[in-house]
């Protein structure tokens, strides 16, 4: 697993390729957090959508990338990312 990555609301980081990114979108309720998945961010045909997770869910997979959510608050999320298939 990689080092921790800390994102505030609106900040992005790359997933396994630089075409795919995620951004922290905050917490729409006290028990739910949201991550935006973005595809082809530099292209004209870029796509993005929100993913919603219960705050209790600490292990998630986005685009075949394992993500461990170490801490999540309304303003900040701390993650560790690793890849496997």
Regions inferred by a protein language model and the residue ranges of each:
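Surface-exposed, beta-sheet-biased, low-hydrophobicity segments with strongly acidic/polar composition
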Residues: 1-85
